[in-house]
């Protein structure tokens, strides 16, 4: 088994209108029974997720608030990966009638067209904050906090390499964590730019697309995709005709032969 972690977005990927269908839950259970791990990577605040999705115990870890919070369902432990923006920032948004406005443990979120007011407040206060878009959602987070950073923190605690992870998502805020994963998958309803960058696009939409992916993952470990996933290949050099020679970063054995001092150690490192 090469891929033993599935990292999935929630809204628009696992869930339709905030709800996960029974068929999708059954597929997640099959994946767990295969010996693999599940990580949920979502922009939702944890309390909101727990309210709409009672099956969080299926997941080994939840990356919430777009990468700002780790939650371990088995122990109910939480770990913050950033600091909430100052209260003065939140006060300005409220004084300027930004609505809706949600303030999580770290994330501050609203919706289009409030991004102009949000950016103006950041500039006025001289804050080092970033604005991340998720379709109509506008999320404010500390610099460097995103779904990729959150997923990497979860994988580090699990002692698992991103090379062993399949990621699936649908929206622009999924780009970072999908790029981290060895294999990136877009569900059929994903934004065109997400599909363009994905290694594989499912035939089905939302939860049905995740079911499709899980069935393929269990059946073949996605071996049929190995030759088309080249994003993480390592360049060794070029042949006489100028064509590149690349190898996979895993599962490849190479014999280095030559005289002492010929550069074998340099090439290997």
Descriptions of predicted regions:
Residues 17, 22-103:
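Active-site phosphate-binding/coordination module
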Residues 55-58, 65-66, 125, 180-181, ...:
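Short, structured coil segments at secondary-structure junctions
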Residues 7-8:
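Active-site T/S-Asp motif of two-component receiver
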């Amino acid at each position: 088994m090469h891929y033993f972690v599935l990292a999935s977005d929630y809204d628009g990927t696992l869930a339709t209108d905030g709800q996960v269908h029974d068929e999708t839950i059954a597929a997640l259970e099959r994946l767990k029974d295969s010996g693999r791990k599940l990580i949920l990577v979502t922009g939702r605040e944890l309390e909101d997720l727990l309210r709409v999705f009672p099956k969080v115990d299926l997941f080994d870890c939840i990356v919430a608030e777009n990468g700002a919070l780790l939650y371990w369902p088995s122990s109910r432990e939480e770990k913050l990966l950033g600091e909430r923006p100052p209260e003065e920032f939140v006060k300005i948004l409220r004084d300027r009638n930004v609505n809706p406005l949600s303030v999580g443990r770290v994330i501050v979120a609203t919706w289009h067209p409030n991004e102009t007011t949000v950016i103006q407040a950041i500039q006025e206060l001289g804050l080092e904050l970033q604005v991340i878009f998720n379709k109509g959602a506008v999320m404010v987070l500390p610099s460097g906090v995103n779904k990729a950073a959150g997923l990497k923190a979860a994988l580090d605690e699990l002692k698992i390499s991103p090379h062993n992870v399949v990621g699936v998502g649908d929206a622009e805020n999924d780009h970072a964590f999908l790029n981290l994963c060895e294999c990136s998958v877009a569900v059929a309803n994903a934004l065109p730019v997400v599909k363009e960058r994905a290694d594989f696009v499912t035939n089905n939409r939302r939860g049905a697309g995740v079911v499709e992916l899980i069935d393929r993952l269990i059946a073949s470990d996605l071996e049929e995709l190995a030759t088309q996933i080249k994003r993480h290949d390592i360049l060794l050099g070029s042949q006489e005709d100028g064509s590149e020679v690349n190898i996979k970063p895993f599962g490849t054995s190479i014999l280095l032969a030559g005289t002492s001092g010929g550069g074998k150690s340099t090439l290997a490192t």
